[in-house]
Amino acid sequence: MKPNFSKGLIPAIVIEEGTKEVLMLAYMNEDAYEKTLETKRTWFYSRSRQSLWNKGETSGNVQYVQSLYLDCDQDSIVVNVKQVGPACHTGEKTCFHYQII
């Protein structure tokens, strides 16, 4: 089974192995997905830079892929990772650290 990339990008929800805490949301195109499978590290597509990026390539805060899950429509993916260091570029463990309610 493979994601449906007919719209170009799919959301990739990254969760932490063990706790299942949501770490971040990014987007994958087919190339990022294939590189993620090949390297077992997360690759995403930057909408602002219009290019692929490897999480932790410059910061050292890498994500080692443990498993991948497709949703029922095959147009979004959950990436289960072993996180090294914080996931958020702000230095927070997760990008979802602002509580609203």
Swiss-Prot record:
GO terms for cellular component: cytoplasm. Its EC number is 3.5.4.19. It holds the Pfam family PRA-CH. It is found in: Cytoplasm. Mg(2+) binds at residues 71, 73, 75. GO terms for molecular function: magnesium ion binding; phosphoribosyl-AMP cyclohydrolase activity; zinc ion binding. Keywords: Amino-acid biosynthesis, Cytoplasm, Histidine biosynthesis, Hydrolase, Magnesium, Metal-binding, Zinc. Binds 1 Mg(2+) ion per subunit. Binds 1 zinc ion per subunit. The keyword Cytoplasm applies. Pathway: Amino-acid biosynthesis; L-histidine biosynthesis; L-histidine from 5-phospho-alpha-D-ribose 1-diphosphate: step 3/9. One of its GO terms (biological process) is L-histidine biosynthetic process. Signal peptide: none annotated. Its cofactor is Mg(2+); Zn(2+). Homodimer. Belongs to the PRA-CH family. HAMAP family: HisI (MF_01021). This is Phosphoribosyl-AMP cyclohydrolase. It comes from Bacillus cereus (strain G9842).
